Regions:
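Gram-negative outer-membrane beta-barrel transporters
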Residues: 329, 379-385, 495-497, 501-505, ...
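Flexible loop and strand-edge segments within Gram-negative outer membrane beta-barrel domains
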Residues: 200-206, 216-222, 232, 236-278, ...
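Periplasmic-side early beta-strands and strand-to-turn transitions of outer-membrane beta-barrels
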Residues: 139-140, 152, 159-161, 165-169, ...
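Short acidic/polar hinge/loop motifs at secondary-structure boundaries
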Residues: 108-135, 217
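Outer membrane beta-barrel strand-and-loop segments of large Gram-negative receptors
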Residues: 218, 310-323, 365-373, 469-475, ...
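Signature of Gram-negative outer-membrane beta-barrel scaffolds
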Residues: 332-436, 451
């Protein structure tokens, strides 16, 4: 499949004669309904297509890093991290690898149905037209799950569609990055087919001072393909059909550390833009994940397999229906309903003796949410107000943990958990006041929630000598928050936004240390000496105070951008987790900074971005700290003929040691070292 996708990507370098009607009148957009006016009251940042296409890495997670306070659980990206660590969050609501920010693509939730992480290699940058990041919870308009905020990805629409686009670049460590797309436009619609492929021999994740004979480079190979067709089916109505497939294979730098992901998505959205606006969406997602795990001895001379997660099938399906009744000038109302149903299980071989497994585990279940929502905006003179409410019904069903002995088939763990259900009421209110020309005051209050993932509920796991037990009794997480800030636009093309906020997330899910090996512990079995026993638990709360600044300026051919976030997250815990009270959640830096400059001229275009991440704790007990890091990425584009440009890119220009993990033995894993790319782009 990989070779086929690569051939498709490179085929984008040939002309597409079928696009001769590209100048015809386009009456469809490929978009959803218009943005809500009440969004003016929120902390909102928009990333345009120009920036999406011109990052140093050409990867979505690098583009999202422009938004200070956006974070994944680990600092490493989707070329070397284990996929399960790539949940996404905002505003210091961290300490957990599941996503606490809601990520949607054209209205479809994108978190993995089983584990809540994000399959970043499935999002080729060339397919995206715009990214909207709304910080703060309570965004019930897009569904449940927006604790920390909402990240909306929009596919390329009619305006940005081009007959031919393609790029190919060769990089450090035998890396290859290729994308391509073909587009066809007609008066009644458009179609786009695209593919992307990336591979590399990888770097050695363990830093040189800690390496042993067992350590080796961590290669990766990733591919995706996408088909999107948009057709007018009535004078004011269009149908949008999308299908995507991806594969992802990575190794973590030792034997028995490979993990793979694959998935297929299909979605149908119908949008009506008549007097009564409306849209209907239906989608289905299938996923599978595999991962091997190894124990490394203290001298790092041997790797011994400890677990083979050989099959993790998961399915998500859902839909939404929304109407926008005509209520007159200054009033916008959206009413709707949605549902998302998830199922999945992990199948694992564990307890290896003489290199062979002797036990089998199956763990999984089903979860679902169904909700009603209303979102209203009022524009009256200098005041814009927003009021949103959402009522959800949730269910957790068919939960199980089954463990058997391979030799006899005899079960030794048979746990079937009681079904649970409940309701959640959430909402948001906000106000924006135009106090003067170019000066807007903003405030908002909100409440959001998230259902635990199947992974958190039912799957125990091990990382090296440490073992973490699942918890089928986890409660949903709930956040309450308040924002206040302003947006200043002193001149055309200049914008500065400042926001202060407070969030309290009740029933915070965290991996809580309960004991140390050697010993036998509930839910995981034996933990060897030097290993820790943890369990997923609901802490009392996580409180975060913070503030953020976003600024941009367009000065002729030069554009400046900057984003800063400072947070003070504090755990509130009692009972078995009382030792965590007053500590900071793991993997949560207090300060984030991103700043960049872009130049677009006749002879060349260039971009440079600097990012700083403050130190953060590796563990829940705040005993080990990852050092602060500053990285610089850059890009240069030089046109050679019309539609063809040469490109040079560099990631981590000064080869900063970006620490991604720190073991109890002091072994440091790093994120991406300096990586240089040289290639070409075409666009017709």
């Amino acid at each position: 499949m990989h070779k086929t996708l690569l051939a498709l990507a490179l085929a984008a370098t040939t002309p597409l004669h079928a696009a001769e009607a590209e100048d015809a009148l386009i009456t469809v957009t490929g978009k959803g309904l218009k943005d809500l006016p009440g969004d003016a009251a929120l902390s909102l940042v928009v990333i345009d297509r120009g920036r999406i296409l011109n990052s140093g890495s050409n990867r979505l997670e690098s583009v999202l890093a422009d938004i200070a306070g956006q974070a994944q659980f680990r600092r490493s990206d989707s070329r070397s991290a284990n996929a399960t660590s790539q949940g996404i969050t905002l505003r210091g609501l961290g300490g957990n690898a599941s996503s606490r920010a809601l990520l949607v693509l054209d209205g479809v939730p994108q978190a993995d149905p089983f584990g809540g992480w994000v399959a970043f290699p499935s999002f080729a940058t060339g397919r995206l037209d715009r990214i909207r990041v709304t910080r703060g919870g309570g965004s019930g308009y897009w569904g449940a799950g927006a604790l920390a905020g909402t990240i909306e990805l929009e596919s390329v629409g009619a305006e940005a569609l081009q007959p031919v686009m393609g790029s190919i670049a060769l990089g450090s460590r035998e890396s290859l990055d290729a994308q391509g797309s073909l587009g066809l436009r007609r008066e009644g619609g458009f179609a786009m087919v695209s593919a992307a492929y990336g591979r590399g021999d990888g770097f050695i994740p363990i830093v040189a001072r800690n390496r042993g004979p067992v350590d080796r480079p961590a290669p990766y190979e990733q591919a995706s393909a996408n088909l999107r067709v948009v057709v007018r089916i009535a004078p004011d109505t269009e149908a949008q059909v999308t299908a995507t497939a991806f594969t992802d294979s990575r190794e973590r730098g030792t034997e028995f550390s490979r993990n793979t992901s694959e998935g297929v998505d299909a979605a149908l959205r119908v949008v009506g833009r008549g007097t009564w606006g409306w849209q209907a969406l239906a989608y289905v997602q299938t996923r599978n994940f595999t991962s091997d795990f190894a124990a490394i001895n203290a001298a790092r001379t041997t790797a011994t397999q400890t677990l083979a997660q050989y099959d993790t099938p998961a399915t998500g399906w859902g839909g939404r229906l929304e109407i926008a009744p005509p209520l007159g000038s200054g009033i916008t109302l959206r009413l709707g309903a949605d549902t998302r149903q998830l199922s999945g299980q992990t199948n694992e071989l564990f307890t290896f003796v003489a290199g062979r497994p002797i036990r089998l585990r199956e763990a999984g279940g089903r979860t679902g949410t169904t909700g009603l929502f209303a979102d209203a905006s009022l524009e009256a003179g200098i005041v814009t107000a927003t009021l949103a409410a959402r009522l959800d019904w949730w269910a957790i069903r068919n939960g199980r943990l089954l463990e058997t002995t391979l030799a006899t088939g005899a079960p030794f763990t048979t746990l079937r958990f009681a079904d649970r259900s409940g309701e959640e009421f959430t909402g948001r209110a906000g106000l924006a006041i135009k106090a003067a020309d170019g000066f807007i005051l903003r405030s908002a209050a909100y409440r959001g929630w998230r259902l635990p993932t199947l992974n958190e509920l039912y799957r125990p796991f091990r990382v090296g000598p440490d073992a973490t037990a699942a918890n089928a009794l986890l409660n949903p997480e709930r956040v309450t928050g308040v924002d206040a800030g302003f947006t200043l636009s002193p001149a055309a093309g200049i914008s500065i936004g400042v926001t202060a906020f407070w969030n309290r997330m009740d029933d915070t899910i965290a991996n809580v240390t309960q004991g140390a090996g050697p010993g036998t512990f509930t839910g995981v079995g034996f933990v060897a000496a030097g290993g820790l026993y943890r369990q997923r638990q609901n802490l009392d709360a996580l409180e975060v105070w913070g503030w953020e600044v976003d600024a941009s300026a367009k000065l002729g051919d030069i554009a400046l951008r900057g984003s800063f976030s400072q947070v003070d997250p504090t755990i509130r815990a009692t009972g078995a987790a009382a030792l965590l009270n007053g500590l900071r959640p793991a993997q949560t830096p207090r300060t984030n900074l991103s700043a960049g400059i872009d130049y677009s001229g006749r002879l060349f275009s260039a971009s440079a971005t600097v990012r700083h991440i403050a130190s953060q704790f590796e563990d829940d007990q705040n005993s080990r700290s990852l050092a602060a890091a500053t990285m610089v990425d850059a890009l240069l584009l030089v046109p050679v003929i019309k539609g063809v440009a040469l490109e040079g890119r560099v990631e981590n220009l000064f080869d900063e040691e970006v620490q991604a993990a720190l073991s109890g033995a002091g072994v440091v894993e790093r994120a991406l070292p300096r990586t240089v790319w040289v290639g070409a782009r075409i666009s017709f």
